[in-house]
Swiss-Prot record:
It comes from Streptomyces wedmorensis. Keywords: 4Fe-4S, Antibiotic biosynthesis, Cobalamin, Cobalt, Iron, Iron-sulfur, Metal-binding, Methyltransferase, S-adenosyl-L-methionine, Transferase. One of its GO terms (biological process) is methylation. Pfam families: B12-binding (PF02310), Radical_SAM (PF04055). InterPro entries: Cobalamin-bd, Cobalamin-bd_sf, Elp3/MiaA/NifB-like_rSAM, Fom3-like, Methylthiotransferase_CS, rSAM, rSAM_horseshoe, Tetrapyrrole_Bchl_Biosynth_MTs. Its EC number is 2.1.1.308. Residues 38-195 form the B12-binding domain. This is Cytidylyl-2-hydroxyethylphosphonate methyltransferase. GO terms for molecular function: 4 iron, 4 sulfur cluster binding; cobalamin binding; metal ion binding; methyltransferase activity.
Amino acid sequence: MTIGSLGSTEFALHGKPAIRWGDLPQRVGKPETRRYQKVLLLNPSATLFRHDLPRCTYPLGLGYIAAVLEKYGYEVKILDVFAEGYYNAQPVDGDDQFLRYGLSDDDIVKVMKEFGPDVVGISSIFSNQADNVHHLLKLADLVTPEAVTAIGGAHARYFPKACLDDPNLDAVFLGEGEMTFLLWMEHLNGNVSDDEVHGIAWRDRDGKVQIKPELPLISSMRPEGPETGKSSPMLSMAGELDHIPFPAWHHYNMEKYFEIKAYQSPYTVGSRVGQLYTSRGCTAHCTFCTTTHFWGQKLRRRSVQDVVDEVLRLRDEYGIDEFHIQDDNITNDMDHARELFRAFKEVGLPWATPQGTALWRMDEELLDLMAESGAYQVTFAIESGVQRVLKELIKKPLNLERTSHLIKYARSLGMHVHGFFIIGMPPMCGNAGESIEEMQASYDYAEEAGFSSASFFAASPIVGSELLRECIRQGFVDPEESLYRMTYKQGIINVPGLWDGEEIAELAAKFNRDFNARRDRAYTPQKQWNANQY
C-alpha cells in the first residue's frame, strides 16, 4: 500500500524504504498508467455492552464523501458493516460483557473481492471502536494489498500518530472529509500538486508522522469543475454547505435500516425514518463536547430550500414517513429555525430532534412552530439540574428556571420531551467537582421540570474535549487504557476523596431505571402525533 509523501515525489510502503512512482508499477503504477478509480467506504462493526440496544443510524459522513467523489467521476461503494450484520452479535475476545455487532469476516472479504477497490476508506469516529477499524484495515491488506487505505473521523483526527502505528494504514484524514478525500484522490491520480492537498497525516520513509494542516471549513469553499473528475477541482471562497451534494442515499441499503427500526430515538411514529443535518458547528463551548473542535465554533447552515429538497427526495424516492434532525442545535439561529419549521409544515411529515436543541436559543414561538409543523418529540440536552455545575463545570449557557418553563410549555403542546443529563463531572479549572448531592439534585430537577423521559449518562471524557484534557492533567483517567473501553454507561473518571467511576455508573443506571419506569410516563407516539395533526 502506498501514500504520497505530499511534500516530495516519494511514497512510503508499510514502513519500508520509500518508493517513487513507477519503481513498483505492479503495485503502484504511474498516475498516467493507473487510475485510482474505485473507492470502498466502510462503516465498521460496533462493540457494545451486552444489554445495550444497538442503535442503527445511517453513516451520513460516508454518504457525503461518496456523493462528492461520484460527482467527480469516481466509482464508489458504501458497506455498512454494522447495519448489514446487525443481527450477528458475537462476544468480544471471550468477554461476555461486550458484544460485537457486524458482518462476519467472510462476508466482508466477499464484498472486497467482488468490488476490487483501489482505495479503502474507513470511518473512525469513536475511540472505543478503534479495534474494529484496525481489524478492517487488516482485512483490506489481506484481500486487496494493492489498495491504498485511509481513515477519518474524530478518533482518527485526534490520534493520527497512534493510528499510523498500524502498518496497514496509509493515511489519516483530519477534519471534514468531503474536500480532503476528493483532493487526495485527485493527487493520487496526478491531477493536483502536493501543495493543494491538506488535512492529511502519513508516515515518511524515516517512519516519522507528517501532518499537513486542515482545509478551511466547507462553508468557505466550493468544489467546481466537470462532472467527470478528469481535471483538478477548483477551490472557490464563495461556497457554502448547499454546494455539497445530498448524501449518496442510493449507496445505503435503505430497506435494511427500515427493517431494523433501531433509530437513535426510540420514540418513532413512522417505520421508514430518514435522518439529515441542517447545519454544522456550534456556538456553545461545553467542556464534555467536541462539536466546536471538529465542526467549528460558528454555526454553518444549509438553506431552508436545500433541507426541504432533501426531505422531499427521501419521501418521494425512499418512502420515508418520518424524519429526524441530527443537528446538535437546530434552533441556534432562531430566525433560520422559524423559516425551517414553517417549511416543514408544508412537507407534512412527523419529525423529531433526538440529538437535542439549543435551549438557550429557544422560545415559545419556536415551540409552537415545531408542534404545528409535525414535531412530536423533542430532546432537551439539559446536562445538569444544578446551576453551579452548568456554569463552572459544563459551561453550558442555560438558565434552569427558564428551561423549566420551556419544558412544561412543550409538554402542553403535546410533545414528548426527552432530557439528557450528565453526572459525575470532576473538578474543572479550579472549581469543585460535582458532589453526589448535586447529582441527586439533577435527578430531582428532571422530576420537577416534567420531562416525559430522560437519559442519565456517566460523564465521559471523549477525545478532543476539554473534559479529557482536564482529566488527564489531574490524573483522573488512564488514557492508555480507559478511552478504548469507554461508553456512556461506564464511569472511567475517578476523583480520589470524592467518588469513583464505578459509583457514578451505578448511580446513572439507577437514575435511568427509576425515572423511566413510572407508569404515568407511558407514551404512545402515534396517539401523540394524531393529537397534533393540523
